[in-house]
């Protein structure tokens, strides 16, 4: 379980997060939704210790993350940022192997290769694993980075807009894969996502942010409501039920 208690963050005097508290339950997919600038990515980065908080506390499995050893934390928590830049020429397989660094320190074992090959298989990258990243489409590159996170084999996986650059087919495949990681392997996944319909269909719990505050949280059946979404997005979004899934018709 991850507990965020009264976390605040400012940049240059501008409040990005204000007295934010939320609990992430284990073994579930939790989605952060909200308009641009709401604080979603900042909250995720603070939870993963990529950004320092100004105040507040964050606990992972009962331990304050500031007190966690970095090497041990990397075995428990992995994160994929919104923008990923690597300045050396790597193949997909090379990149995915980086996910094992917390365990191998660069000296890969047979067990490491099991995780690497499993991640490549999950992401359907075996046939192109020897291609260089600069030879890939945006979607293929995104899938390679997600495979690296999977290879890290952590209890907690934090993903900042992982559907960027993906077409509909691969977006659905990614979300189904994340669901499998939760249901089959017991992973806990937190995802920043813009499409409320992906959040509705695949999340166990949704947290909505606006202007640096959590304005609403709950299961999809409570969150994907016209009145709730209007408070979050300042627009009226009709809701339809299709195959027992609540879908927001926001493009009409």
Curated annotation (Swiss-Prot):
List the EC numbers from the record: 7.2.2.-
Catalyzed chemical reaction(s): a Fe(III)-siderophore(out) + ATP + H2O = a Fe(III)-siderophore(in) + ADP + phosphate + H(+)
Pfam families assigned to the protein according to its UniProt record, in alphabetical order: ABC_tran
Residues binding ATP, per UniProt: 34-41
Subcellular location field? Cell membrane
The record's section on PANTHER family has:
IRON(3+)-HYDROXAMATE IMPORT ATP-BINDING PROTEIN FHUC, PETROBACTIN IMPORT ATP-BINDING PROTEIN YCLP
Name-wise, this protein is Petrobactin import ATP-binding protein YclP
